[in-house]
């Protein structure tokens, strides 16, 4: 039994060798084009990524806007949690607060959103930045509708509420602007 020899190695034909190499490269995804038309030279460049390709070209003022938004959400949340009467009075000049619980729940929800805003400030991922900006725009849009409906019901109109509505609409416009700017395809260099 010790005298039995293994079968001789067979040589591959050049055509099947090329097909095999092509299949291997296709499985690994090396050499082909990705969705953006980039051709990867090696698997390492695919895994590590191309910095130019993955770098987000941030619009001017985006990080400042994110910081201001996070500060705004945090400060209003803290005010709603700690001083619900004063917040309600600032929005609806002189109206009586019937219950503090809804205002405090509003503050808790805003605090949760502000945590998302603070985390988005430190990320470079386009998707997270865009979702945060969309969340902001939706929040300010819904808040504008709610304040408008409340003013229509109560009939109380003051300079403070008009300024609040104008600022909320401005925030919606700025958030949507940055949302679309971050989502644009980068120009090929």
Swiss-Prot record:
Protein name: Tumor protein p53-inducible protein 11
Broad class of the protein's primary localization: membrane
Annotated compartments: Membrane
One of the Pfam families matching this protein, by short name: p53-inducible11
Modified positions (Phosphoserine) in chain numbering: 14
InterPro entries per UniProt: TP53I11 (IPR028266)
Keywords annotated in UniProt: Membrane, Phosphoprotein, Transmembrane, Transmembrane helix
Superkingdom, taxonomy of origin: Eukaryota
Keyword Lyase: no
Keyword Transmembrane helix: yes
Sequence ranges on the Cytoplasmic membrane side: 1-63, 130, 177-189
Membrane-spanning ranges: 64-84, 109-129, 131-151, 156-176
Ranges in the topological domain labelled Extracellular: 85-108, 152-155
GO cellular component: membrane
Membrane topology term: Multi-pass membrane protein
